[in-house]
A protein has these predicted regions:
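Short, amphipathic alpha-helical interaction segments embedded in low-complexity terminal/linker regions
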Residues: 234-302
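Glycine-rich phosphate-binding loops that contact phosphosugars or nucleotide phosphates
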Residues: 88, 92-225, 234-238
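Short, basic, glycine/proline-bearing loop/turn elements
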Residues: 55-65, 131, 156-159
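Single conserved hydrophobic/aromatic residue that forms the stacking wall/gate
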Residues: 1-14
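Cofactor-/ligand-binding subdomain signature composed of acidic, glycine-rich
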Residues: 24-62
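Residues at the C-terminal ends
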Residues: 82-83, 178
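A short, well-structured juxtamembrane/interface segment
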Residues: 65-80
Length: 302
């Protein structure tokens, strides 16, 4: 493992020693604690499903406890994006995939350029489909990849790691802070090294997983919920939603075109033919609404 001197100091403060293990009384990896569900292979399908669901019901409460920190982060993001800043999600494994997923949904849902919210995963695109060996253990690679995107202090970096100990993520956040970039983290262990290098740490404590150590489960579910909350709230505050409708969505298939037509019918109280024509002329629901209200009329075919 390549490790900067500063990153090594972080690990020392947190009790990190040889072999990347922790022996500090101040840091307990809840994500590695034994499951309360035992002898899983002896349970029926129904018992397994109910057990998983029982654990999943704990996630929403854990996320709710994080709302004050999420609110702080969203306010900072909105301010920076108004000034041309971008959101960067950075993670490895499931955490990285969830960041890439959330970023990929922003253009079609809210009509924003794909450069506004960027997801980066350790190991690159191939890691979206299969594990890339040792990718998360390189503490310098994350920052190098952020530099490829010309990250600046206008941007926001959100590091995602259930354990809070992923070198790829910690190293990137530490370097970002050194360059005056706002950093946030999402983890499932309190007092982790990742939290210590984040300006806004979000610690979502979901407890031990149904299968011991399988953080793709509750931790992954909670990460997805928090990412949904962040990106959705930011886009609403940036004016990308009207009422409760996705008026800036990309009209990329028949379903979305039909949805756009119905939005215009509901909002403007016009008939389906008029709505279709208006949408075709303007190219988006938002532009159609603005054009109609500006002109207070619609061009009709004779």
């Amino acid at each position: 493992l390549r490790m900067s001197r500063g990153l090594g100091d972080v690990y020392k403060r947190q009790g990190r020693i040889k072999g990347l293990s922790f022996r500090s009384m101040n840091f307990i990896k809840i994500t590695e604690q034994p499951s309360i569900h035992e002898d899983l292979e002896q349970k029926s399908v129904r018992e397994l499903l109910e057990g998983i669901n029982e654990e999943d019901r704990k996630v929403a409460s854990a996320v709710h406890a994080c709302i004050p920190q999420i609110e702080k982060l969203v306010n900072e993001i909105v301010e920076r994006m108004h000034q041309g800043g971008r959101i960067f999600y950075l993670g490895a494994g499931t955490s990285g995939r969830l960041g890439v997923l959330d970023a990929s949904e922003i253009p079609p849902t809210f009509g924003m350029p794909d450069t506004c919210v960027i997801g980066i995963i350790a190991g690159g695109e191939q890691a979206l489909k299969r594990p890339v060996e040792n990718a998360e253990d390189d503490s310098q690679k994350g920052w190098m990849e952020l530099q490829d995107h010309h990250i600046t202090n206008k941007d926001i970096l959100i590091g995602i790691a259930a354990s809070g100990t992923t070198p790829y993520v910690i190293g990137a956040l530490q370097k970002a802070r050194e360059h005056g970039i706002l950093t946030a983290s999402i983890s499932s262990n309190p007092g982790s090294p990742l939290s210590s290098v984040a300006d806004i740490p979000i610690e979502m404590i979901v407890g031990p997983e149904f299968i011991t150590g399988s953080s793709r489960m509750k931790s992954g579910t909670g990460q997805k919920m928090i990412l949904n909350m962040i990106s959705t709230t930011v886009m609403i505050k940036l004016g990308r939603v009207k009422g409760n409708r996705m008026v800036n969505m990309q009209l990329s298939n028949r379903k979305l075109i039909d949805r756009g037509v119905q939005m215009l019918i509901d909002e403007l109280h016009i008939n389906k033919a008029e709505a279709k024509q208006l949408l075709q002329e303007q190219g988006s629901v938002k532009k159609a609404l603005d054009a109609y209200k500006t002109n207070n009329c619609i061009t009709k075919n004779n």
